[in-house]
């Protein structure tokens, strides 16, 4: 299997959790971008990856296969569009966008460019979701949540 080369947009706590988890995979963190060079440097140091000022500079960086978007949610759509246009796979923190129209536009662009688009949605393994699935499987007529 090909090793996935990652870039991370954002340097907050969720981006750090992703970078830590990435260390346990065969993926490689190539670069991280923040609004300031200093913030990117502080984040990148433990991972030995490149620190980039400006999110768009990371998106255009050659050699990156996939980008994890962990910026404020109002910027997700804009950054995801740029990534998909450059045929870079996108793993976007939730919510992927702030409305259904933007989400459908991303899905359409992803399909057009044959590029992966995925929301970082962890609720499939959440205990409440598993319990709900169990109850639905039992065909209970009334479910209270």
Enumerate the language-model features and the residues they cover:
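Conserved SAM-binding strand-loop segment of SAM-dependent methyltransferases
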Residues: 49-55
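N-terminal Rossmann-like dinucleotide-binding module
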Residues: 1-47
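Local beta-strand N-terminus motif with an aromatic residue
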Residues: 29, 64-67, 140-141
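Beta-strand-loop-alpha-helix segment that lines the small-molecule cofactor/substrate pocket
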Residues: 66, 72-73, 77-122
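Basic phosphate/pyrophosphate-binding loop/patch that engages nucleotide-derived ligands
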Residues: 108-116, 130-141
């Amino acid at each position: 299997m090909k090793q996935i080369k990652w870039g991370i947009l954002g340097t907050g706590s969720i981006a750090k959790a992703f970078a830590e988890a990435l260390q346990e995979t065969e993926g490689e963190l190539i670069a991280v971008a923040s609004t300031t060079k200093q913030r990117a440097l502080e984040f990148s140091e433990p991972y030995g990856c490149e620190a980039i000022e400006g999110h768009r500079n990371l998106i255009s960086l050659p050699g990156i296969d996939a980008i994890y978007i962990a910026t404020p949610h109002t910027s997700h759509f804009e950054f995801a569009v740029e990534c998909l246009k450059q045929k870079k796979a996108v793993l976007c923190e939730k919510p992927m966008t702030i409305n259904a129209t933007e989400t459908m536009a991303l899905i359409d662009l992803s399909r057009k460019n044959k590029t992966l688009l995925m929301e970082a949605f962890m609720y499939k393994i959440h205990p409440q979701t598993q319990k709900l699935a169990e109850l639905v499987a039992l065909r209970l007529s009334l479910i209270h949540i």
